[in-house]
């Protein structure tokens, strides 16, 4: 894509005004911006993602990889969620986990980049219309999609970056509602990223208690 941008850029007038927009602005993007702009002014619009973190109750679980499934079942049995999104880091794990949940009486849908767009739209509509309450997703749905009734996000696999974490958990508690997030920490790399999130965003996170106070997140919708 960068080559296409450069090709277009070279055909534009030398004397011009250039504006570039990005949802996030990591150092790698800043480097690219400098190639197309001279002494640019950086404008940061309200960082909704970070502000939203403060409205979420965030929990973590230290465990081994082999313990994840049992802990997930325990959480789904005990948490009174409206809808939940469970994030994993690969398409294979996305399909496998969704299948396992469905076979164990937790009807689930799996959404990832390998699905045809028509199928993704169909599954998206099922979830948005509250016909499905559990979604297993890859980073594809880590940002840019909002569901009114999602009040729980579970990081079955820790995100690969602090920025991705912020966007993932931001799927919970949208539109002024409450929400909780639960992150599985299975190794040192998981802990490193989680600690970075806590430090950079000045948020509080607690070990997952035996029972979560239902008053800290939205109750079930009544239809």
What annotation goes with each model-predicted range?
Residues 1-223:
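Conserved helicase RecA-like core
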